[in-house]
Amino acid sequence: MSEVRTGFLTMTTIILISIGLTMMGTGLYQKTTMSSCIRETSSQFTLLGLLLLLIPQIGLYGICCRSKRLFNFFFYGMVVLIIIVSYYSIKCSIYNTTFGIAKNPAKDNRTVPQLLGRLVSKEKFEKVTYCIIHKHDCNYNASKNSNVWKYCCAQPVGCGTITMFDKPGEWSWKHQYERNQVPEECSYEYCLDCRGCQLSILKAIVHQWKYLSMFAYPALVLSCISLAIAWSLKETIHENEDYRGSYS
């Protein structure tokens, strides 16, 4: 029976390691390729991936080496991991259920002041907006899961072919073209003050938590299963000392 439980524990730890590796790889990749203002992942995402990568590995070593000490480190490490993953899972659930913004932010009946301060601080919102303004960070990858491109960076209706920078048909923020003389309603600051734009920025910030929940929920379930199996095996793990002896 203990062999079966050991097999299940090995499988769950391998899956947890795979989730952690995926999270770390995704976080590091997006850090180099995605917008520095709005990302799907954050430092918390990468940190959680690192914990999921390291702690289950201790369990694998403990099982393979029949090491009581390593297995105890794994057991208490999983307790800490479950507490951390539970915290993020609860936070993800709160964001996803109470902070949903319409797919088309411009049609959301709520105003930005109504939403600021509850789950997204005013400082966080202003920091992201400030980042967009000063880095002109409106490339497609900056907002592939939000409408920031559509509601903040696209040319406003009625502005014709006049653009913020001298490149017909689009606004380019990655290259500093010679600035055109544009009407006030076509200015970048004007667009960032639009409700649809502001709500789309909020939606992009909250999307980080929706993306994290895709990994946090299954990681929490598997961590609880691993801990339960580890508890049942805790007293059966003993170091194999058969190889230790003396030669005559």
From Swiss-Prot:
InterPro entries, per database record: TET_plant, Tetraspanin/Peripherin
Membrane-spanning residues: 8-28, 45-65, 70-90, 211-231
A cellular-component GO term for this protein: membrane
Cytoplasmic side: 1-7, 66-69, 232-248
Main location: membrane
Compartment annotation: Membrane
Superkingdom, natural source: Eukaryota
Name of protein: Tetraspanin-17
Positions bearing carbohydrate: 96, 109, 141
UniProt keyword terms in alphabetical order: Glycoprotein, Membrane, Transmembrane, Transmembrane helix
Family: Belongs to the tetraspanin (TM4SF) family.
Function: May be involved in the regulation of cell differentiation.
Keyword Transmembrane: yes
Organism placement in taxonomy: Eukaryota, Viridiplantae, Streptophyta, Embryophyta, Tracheophyta
Origin species: Arabidopsis thaliana
Residue spans, topological domain Extracellular: 29-44, 91-210
Membrane topology, as annotated: Multi-pass membrane protein
GO biological process annotation, one example: auxin-activated signaling pathway
